[in-house]
Amino acid sequence: VRAAGTGREARDFFSAAVYFQSPLQFGRAEAEHYVWFAERGYRVGIGLMLSSGGTGPATLAGALSLQLAELLCIHMLQRAVWGERRLDLYCSLTPLDMRRGMYPYGRPERPLAAVAMAQMARRYRASFAGHAGHADAKRPSCEAGAQKVLTALPLLMACGSAHISAGLLSVDEVFSPIQMILDEEATAALQRFARGFEITEETLAFDTTAQVGPGGCFTDTDHTLRHFRGEHWQPGLGSRDMRRAWQDAGSRTDVDLARERYRDVMSRPNTTTVLSSGQVSDRPETLDRKVSKGCESTGFEETCRSGERR
């Protein structure tokens, strides 16, 4: 649709990937798909999802060395077929759950491996992208939030950027609009953390401190009025009361508040309109929002399976 609306080639909008069969194998079916598209001018990415203790060594050092070798192999293939000269490294390494055989996304070894690969990318002067911001939890919960932040924060500190897959749960089996609202709150907090703070004559506030004096209060100063909105993050769902006031207001948790917000949004009239081809080319992200909107409008308040959403 986008290609027809802009007069450009379909390959300009094409995106697809096949995956290595670790350890050290590019499967026959995947290779055939790769070649078929390449012969027609369509570039297909090659990904890795190595598991420590499963398709790679149980030690992180061993698994990382294997993943690096496979990434270099992929780079050589892309260079031979497409002339790619840039070296891109990324990491989606995670430990295999030895009790249940699960490929988990919310374990601490995952960001640890990603930070180590980021250091290797810096050594080789390569670009880097880490896989983060996911959860194994099946419902909106403390588990989900902790796992998403646990995997995103180390990459944010090491690389200066990270992402959270808003709304995804159970690795990527479930989409929840409730979790999406909670993830927006977590993302906003991480953005505030990443922004840091300025040290200037104004922000050091020596004059204001002298004005307030020992035992004084800064709340009613002009300096506080000028700066608190930009300096202090303002939560939309997080607690802003002590326990007694929270109980008097109904003892609602963050999940309760997110559910209320979701129901409020869904109760509003649907104002979605059909876009012209020009609007599609100008605002391609609108299509992604419409896909999410279609998921939310199915009537499932808590969760929507990603397979149905596609």
Language model segments and positions:
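Short acidic (Asp/Glu) and glycine-rich catalytic loops that position anionic groups and cofactors
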Residues: 51, 94-97, 128-132, 163-173, ...
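Flexible, glycine/charged-enriched surface loops at secondary-structure junctions
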Residues: 8-11, 47, 82-90, 125-131, ...
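Hydrophobic alpha-helical bundle architecture
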Residues: 114-219
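Catalytic-core signal marking the mid-to-C-terminal active-site face
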Residues: 178-310
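Flexible, active-site-adjacent loop/turn segments at secondary-structure boundaries
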Residues: 56, 62, 172-173, 180, ...
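Helix-rich catalytic cores of soluble enzyme domains
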Residues: 1-161
